[in-house]
Structures are given as structure tokens and as C-alpha cells.
Amino acid sequence: TGAALTPVGLNGAALQLFTHGTITGLLFVVVGLVYDRAHTRHIPELGGLMRRMPIIGVGFVVAGLASLGLPSTSGFVAELLIFLGTFPVFAWATALSAFGVVLAAGYILWTVQRTFFGPSQARNDNLPDAKLVDAVSIALLLLPIMAIGLYPKLLTDVFDVGILPIISRLGG
């Protein structure tokens, strides 16, 4: 039996589809908000933004940490289920994928540090933080990232309704 034909593996894959959409969506929102205010995406020009844009900064930091699979976020749960589903069948590929998570952590933490926590740039001293509509958008995307990270059964039980019949029909 293949790794993809286990409830754990398929739940991980389905959860990854959902969580990738919310995390990446949040990253696009906050990067767009930074660009709208700073008119640049050049990281060396964006140091110290957390002091000027704390709401946008929190959105970026949480999305970045969820993207690299920080425990208590939906990114962690999805990656864990995928790894648990693939390891018994493809141990070497799972280990290689886990190394990819380490690489992702490196570039995400590098970006977060230099953009939001690095030395402040004078050109950014008057940048405004999120407006109410922006803050609501950030919060609405943060909510499922954290809720699914803390209680994944909110979605995995829903996914099982479709996953279990597929496994049964395929002889898994």
C-alpha cells in the first residue's frame, strides 16, 4: 500500500491544500500592504518595520512561522500528517522533505529578521500601519491558521467524509 492511500497521508495532503491557501494568502496580503506603503519590496530598504507597522508585522511573522511549520499552526499539522503518512513507505524521501523544511525556515527567518526586526530605515519613519479593513483581513486569515493548528479535527473530520470512501474503493 502506498503512502497516499492512508487516512493520515491523505488528510495531510488535503490539509496542506487548505493551509497553503490561507498562509500564502496572508503572506500576499501583508507583502501587498508593505509594498503599498513603502513602494518597494527590496529587503535592505525595509528594516525595522515592526516598530512602524505592528499589525502588518504580526501578520507577516505568524504567516512566515506557519509556513515553516511552527507547532500550534496549521502548517505544522499539515506537514506532520504528511510526514507521518509518507515515512513508513518512503523514509528517505520524507527525510529529504524534512531537510527542505529546515531550508525554508532559514530563508523565512532571514526575511522576517531583516524586514521587520532589522535596523530601522529613516525612509520608513512615517509609514502607516494597517487600516481597520486591512487588520480585519489579516485577522480573518490568521484565525484558521491558528484554529486548525490548535484543533485540526475541525477539518480532518470533514476531510474523512471524502477520504475514507476513496481509500475503501481503492482497496486501502
Task: Show where each model-derived region lies.
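Cytoplasmic/organellar membrane-interface segments at the starts of transmembrane helices
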Residues: 53-56, 108-172
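Functional transmembrane alpha-helices
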Residues: 1-128
